[in-house]
């Protein structure tokens, strides 16, 4: 099924693998899943990234084999693929400190995507309550939190975008509150400067 011409059949096979694969099966199919991360169809890339996440949960030592593909996916223009890539990268960084160190090179790219979402105009496809794809914004913030933890340089690189989110996001709707909450969690977790932490505390005060 993973080599079928119909991308929906490939997606179904990937979903099955993600749902039922054992550690032994994960090792057997890891190479095929990695290859599908660069598939020409965005639907297959998204499903492959989600399946790779499940594979890594089963066998954490397979992380290293997915790093190059995961880094490439973080520059994908398709929102669904990018969301799945953030989930994959977050899982990999939490499982392997060496992968976390290597993935820190992606912080500028992630900040660039986040900035484009913050200042994007309303889009019928991705807009929720006036916010451009809050699900993707939350996923990127969670990944930034993992990458910035314990690293001053990475934390400094993401401080500007975190300040912009904290200052400009409308918290009158649930979508905005979800983004603000993740931004606060990220600011608290990373090596943030004092002014940014004050901003986070003020947002927490509004939540109470």
Question: Where are each of the predicted segments found?
Answer:
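Extended alpha-solenoid helical-repeat scaffolds
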Residues: 1-208
């Amino acid at each position: 099924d993973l080599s079928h011409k119909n991308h929906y059949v490939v997606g179904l096979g990937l979903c099955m693998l993600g749902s039922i694969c054992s550690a032994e099966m994960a090792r057997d199919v890891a190479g095929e899943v990695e290859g599908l991360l660069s598939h020409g169809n965005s639907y297959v890339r998204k499903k492959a990234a989600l399946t790779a996440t499940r594979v890594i949960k089963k066998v954490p030592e397979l992380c290293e084999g997915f790093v190059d593909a995961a880094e490439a996916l973080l520059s994908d223009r398709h929102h669904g693929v990018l969301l799945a890539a953030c989930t994959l990268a977050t899982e990999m960084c939490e499982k392997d400190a060496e992968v976390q160190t290597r993935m820190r090179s992606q912080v500028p790219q992630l900040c660039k995507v986040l900035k484009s979402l913050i200042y994007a105009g309303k889009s019928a496809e991705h807009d929720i309550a006036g916010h451009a794809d809050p699900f993707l914004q939350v996923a990127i913030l969670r990944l930034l939190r993992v990458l910035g933890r314990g690293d001053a340089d990475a934390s400094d690189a993401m401080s500007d975008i975190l300040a912009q989110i904290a200052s400009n996001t409308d918290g009158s709707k649930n979508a905005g509150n979800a983004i603000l909450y993740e931004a606060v969690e990220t600011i608290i977790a990373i090596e943030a400067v004092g002014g940014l932490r004050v901003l986070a505390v003020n947002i927490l005060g509004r939540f109470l």
